[in-house]
Amino acid sequence: MPGVKVKETESFELALKKFKKQCEKAGILSEVRKREHYEKPSIKRKKKAIAARKRAMKKQRKMMD
């Protein structure tokens, strides 16, 4: 869980920036977006297969160059 200790001389903006960076590293925002709406398991499988196909095509294109 991200947490920031704020020093007396530190501004609020700097503390907020540090906190956002820690949240991004922890993957909290992406997790929240993923859980925002229920996704059926069949849809998850379909998205996973599409992503795998895209990765394979990208890898194949890279090997051709």
UniProtKB/Swiss-Prot annotation:
Entry annotated with the keyword Nucleotide-binding: no
Domain of life: Bacteria
Signal peptide feature range: none
Pfam family, one: Ribosomal_S21
Example of a GO cellular component annotation carried by this entry: ribosome
Molecular-function GO terms, alphabetical: structural constituent of ribosome
UniProt record similarity statement: Belongs to the bacterial ribosomal protein bS21 family.
Matches recorded under PANTHER family: MITOCHONDRIAL 28S RIBOSOMAL PROTEIN S21, SMALL RIBOSOMAL SUBUNIT PROTEIN BS21
Annotated protein name in UniProt: Small ribosomal subunit protein bS21B
Lineage start: Bacteria, Pseudomonadati, Thermodesulfobacteriota, Desulfuromonadia, Geobacterales
Gene: rpsU2
